[in-house]
Regions:
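Nucleic-acid endonuclease domains
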Residues: 1-196
Length: 196
């Protein structure tokens, strides 16, 4: 990493801290409790943007589930992450602004009895550029066959493995992303979790 990149990171972090302090002064951030209880999407995603990827993902999951009215389910059910009020099972895949500028879908478990995959890319520099996609289980199977790869292990190591976890990486702004948006864009869900 060069000093130029470090300086940019410091500037970005400084701008986020200023914005967070402004939100606090306006009473948009509670003094205690979990960040996912914040109501305004832009405020929530700005607050968690200063955390690590490992810290952001679970908070974002809780926020999205609360906004959608979904219930967290036990991983032992092998039916994804959440159950909807309509009794559908959802696997949520979220990713945030990153150096590569990609939507990273990791640990796609096609053997699970999931009805839908909700794939969310949060652009932390401009929330309006965020992407929300909804795929059926069958659509995800098709996409994994086209552009997926095993998350762990080699082809030889996975030859006899029936439960292979897959990954898909899509560059934001690429022709592939444009195709996914055309096929799987979920504007109603996007409005609920990110706003219009």
């Amino acid at each position: 990493m060069e000093l130029r990149e470090i300086n940019k990171l410091c500037d970005d972090l400084g701008a986020k801290i200023i914005k967070i302090n402004e939100y606090k002064e306006r009473g948009l951030i509670p003094n205690s409790g979990s960040p996912y209880l914040i109501n305004e999407p832009e405020v929530f995603f700005t607050v968690i943007s200063v955390g690590t990827a490992q810290a952001k993902a679970p908070e974002a999951e809780k926020f999205i589930a609360r906004k959608m009215g979904w219930t967290k389910i036990s991983p032992s059910l092998n039916k994804g992450d959440f159950k909807t009020p309509e009794n559908n099972y959802i696997e949520l895949k979220n990713s945030f602004s990153n150096k590569a500028g990609c939507l990273n879908l990791r640990q796609i478990r096609l053997w699970q009895e999931v009805d839908y995959y909700l794939c969310v890319y949060i652009d932390e520099t401009n929330i309006d550029n965020s992407v929300v996609l909804l795929l059926t289980h069958e659509q995800m199977e098709e996409e994994v066959a086209i552009c997926g790869s095993a998350t762990h292990g080699t082809a030889a190591a996975n030859a006899n493995n029936q439960n292979i976890e897959y990954s898909i990486t899509i560059k934001i702004g690429s022709p592939m992303m444009a195709q996914w948006i055309e096929k799987y864009n979920a504007p109603d869900i996007r409005n609920q979790i990110i706003g219009g």
